[in-house]
Amino acid sequence: MVDIDKDNLPNIIDGNVPKNYELCKEGDIVFADASEDTNEVAKAVEYYNLNGKKVVCGLHTIHGRDNKNKTVVGYKGYAFSSMSFHHQIRRIAQGTKIYSINSKNFSKCYVGIPSKDEQQKIADLLRLIDERIATQNKIIEDLKKLKCAI
């Protein structure tokens, strides 16, 4: 998940949106369309907290949007990062040195979509776990620095 308030991304100057690119909206998801590693093909990132900032998908990405409003913001990033989704992607990724997918391949994949209430609970729980992991990693890094200083 990319929180535009916390994560530093390159900026688009007003009026300079690249041609053939659509601006991302809150909850849009971006997939990597190629990688040297099958674990990284279709790696997903969901955008949230855009707060009016202009964001476009970069090269070698597939831009996804929930046009039918079946998901809550925050759920898709976790759903498309699941092992069950990536097992499906590994079967359909093409290539020998560089593995790739295209938007047509996604029609062969399935992701479970529970009720919106359940999605929100799942997303909130996983976000709290991510925050806890980040906090623990920071503590570990600080302790390593302290150990080296002693």
Features from the language model and the residues they span:
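A short glycine-rich beta-alpha junction/loop motif
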Residues: K54-I62, T71, M83-H86, R90-D117
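Flexible, active-site-proximal loop/turn residues at the rims of small-molecule/cofactor binding pockets
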Residues: E36, K68, S115
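Short, Lys/Arg- and Gly-enriched loop/turn segments at beta-strand edges
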Residues: T38-E46
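Amphipathic alpha-helical segments
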Residues: K76, S107-A149
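Short, solvent-exposed loop/turn positions at domain surfaces
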Residues: G15-P18, G95, R127
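Sequence-specific dsDNA recognition surfaces
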Residues: M1-V30
